[in-house]
Structures are given as structure tokens and as C-alpha cells.
Amino acid sequence: MVEAITPQQFHAAAGVEDWRVLSTSAATCFQTGSFARGVELVERIAALADAANHHPDIDLRYAAVIVRLATHELKPHGFLSERDAALAAQISAAARELGIAADPGKVQTVQIAIDALDIARVRPFWAAVLGYELFGDEDAVDPGGFGPNVWFQQMDAPRPQRNRIHLDIYVPADQAAARIDAAVAAGGTVVRDQGPHWWTLADPEGNEADIAPWPDFDDGS
């Protein structure tokens, strides 16, 4: 049986300096500079993944390749294992051999959060309208893995003074301050400070988003 490891344990593994832990994966971005170089890197990753029988999600763009690793059989009670750390190190080594640099500050994960009094009644609607599947007790997920996850947050009472839907934006821990500063410079305000785990920001009309770097340093406690 595969055992889960914490984000801290993942970061303690050798060779994973290029990677950051987001909400449900360890991820990085490789700056390939061209589509052909990206294909070359993806082919190397595919060979490593087949050899390990452990396959990442890969997003191939013209000048970059984004790679996300997770051990799916652990979810929803965990998402990283030693297999992810081992493959991450191998992928980074392959990129270095090709002269391709990593830029992990480019990665992020966006999640839609919906406040609900009765999650069991509300969640099926959103799964149906989005073409998603129910996952665990609080989520709806895109079966193809393309769209953002939807997480349902339990409310005890209606809160008419604030929106019922907000975005959770998971960023690398070393990018959180810059992201918050940029949002404030663009007219936003910090309305809740739970740093270093998360901050809630609002736009000039009160629409909210959470900047959440906590998965990148979570110790599992």
C-alpha cells in the first residue's frame, strides 16, 4: 500500500528543489523556449513515467511545460508519496541534461469555493451544470482534470454581507507576498490575515479571493 508523505517530507527529498507543493499536487514549470524543445522534454518525461509506472499531468505550451505530480489513489486523504518525490527528481535531472531551466514561481492552482448551508443539496447541482463528478464529501472535480476543482465550504448561517463564491489561489510560498502586493497595488484590500497560511483579499466592490501558500510548507499536523 502506498503511504502518504507531507509537503515538508517531499521538500526534504533530494533533487526536488525545482518543485512547489500546491493544493493537490507538486508542480513546476520548465521554460523550454520553443514547442520543439517542449516536445523533447515531454518525451523524456514520458519515458521516465512509464518506467516508474507513475504518470504526471503535463501541460505543453509553446515556450513552457508545466508538470504536476500526485499519487491519485491517496486522495482525498493525501496526495503525495515517495513516488512523486522520486519522479520529480528524475524529471528535473532530465530537464537539466537538456539545458532547460525550471521556473517554479510560475505555477499556481485555482479553486472555486462555494459557501453552502446544505452541501449535500447544493453540490449535485454544480457537478451537473459543470459536467463534474462528486469527490469525497466536499468537492466536485472535472473528470478530465482540466477545470478548477470546486470546494464546498460549510456555513452555519447565511452571510448576506459577503459573496457566497470566492476563489482559492494556491501559490508557492515564496510567491505569496508578491502576489498580495500586486493585488493591493491593483486596488485590492486585505480583509483577513491568516499568514503565513492564507490571506483573504477583496476587490474594490468586495469580491473576495484567498491567496493560500500553506500547502507548500504543510507538515501534516
Where do the model's predicted regions map?
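Core segments of cupin and vicinal oxygen chelate
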Residues: A116-N149, A178-R179
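Terminal peptide-recognition signature
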Residues: W126, L167, G206
